[in-house]
Design a protein with these regions (language model features):
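Intrinsically disordered and other compositionally biased segments
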Residues: 31, 107, 121-123, 178, ...
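Short, charged/polar low-complexity linear motifs in solvent-exposed/disordered segments
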Residues: 64-67, 113, 167-169, 178
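Helix-centered, glycine/charged polyanion-binding patches within enzymatic domains
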Residues: 82-153
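Polybasic low-complexity intrinsically disordered regions
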Residues: 1-99, 104-105, 175
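Basic, amphipathic alpha-helical segments enriched in Lys/Arg and hydrophobic/aromatic residues
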Residues: 130-189
Length: 189
């Protein structure tokens, strides 16, 4: 198998298609779902998906997404924004021999505190962020944003199901159909 990179991010999906004025009038808060994706930047396909409720932080889903992606593919690099800047994530990537292309927070301190890999990433990014971006091909992270955009444009920004289990199944099905469309347009399907 060819090694792949993955870009990880999350986005919100409305649980209702009713207008915002209904929520305002009746003071009903419907909330939203969070869809967490790992996308292969070269093929643009969703490699892994997790669906959670709105109160789950992106960082908590990094490990399940990565492990699911590793079970199906040989992952060589993982992209993530500042929400995934955690020592545990850097350690997980290092333990599996995966190159970390995670943007650290602006106020990050270059101290190891249990993660030498993160310390090196902080020092590298603080020294020259533009060079780091080019070396890591950090722009490839946008492939996951493109996947969210396509899924929302094709299938809508909401789910039709009422129960959480069925909402998760619906979003997984939408991601699978998105992959099918990508394969068809790229001539692989």
């Amino acid at each position: 198998d060819q090694p792949i990179s993955i870009a990880i991010d999350s986005s919100g999906i409305k649980v209702s298609n009713s207008g915002d004025w209904i929520r305002k009038k009746w003071k009903v808060k419907k909330g939203y779902l969070k869809i967490h994706l790992a996308v292969d930047p070269s093929s643009k396909e969703c490699v892994s998906i997790e669906v959670t409720k709105e109160d789950v932080h992106d960082n908590k889903e990094f490990k399940p997404l990565l492990e699911d992606a590793m079970s199906k593919n040989h992952v060589e690099r993982a992209y993530g924004d500042g929400a995934y800047d955690a020592r545990a994530n850097f350690n997980l990537l290092d333990a599996n021999g995966i190159d970390a292309a995670i943007k650290v927070r602006k106020n990050a301190v270059p101290k190891a505190r249990g993660s030498y890999t993160r310390k090196l990433a902080v020092m590298e990014q603080q020294k020259d962020f533009d060079t780091w971006k080019k070396e890591k091909r950090y722009g490839d992270r946008w492939s996951v944003e493109g996947a969210f955009s396509c899924i929302k444009r094709i299938f809508g920004e909401y789910v039709s199901a009422k129960k959480f289990v069925n909402m998760a199944k619906e979003m997984t099905m939408k991601a699978s159909l998105y992959n099918l469309f990508i394969r068809m347009t790229m001539g692989r399907g």
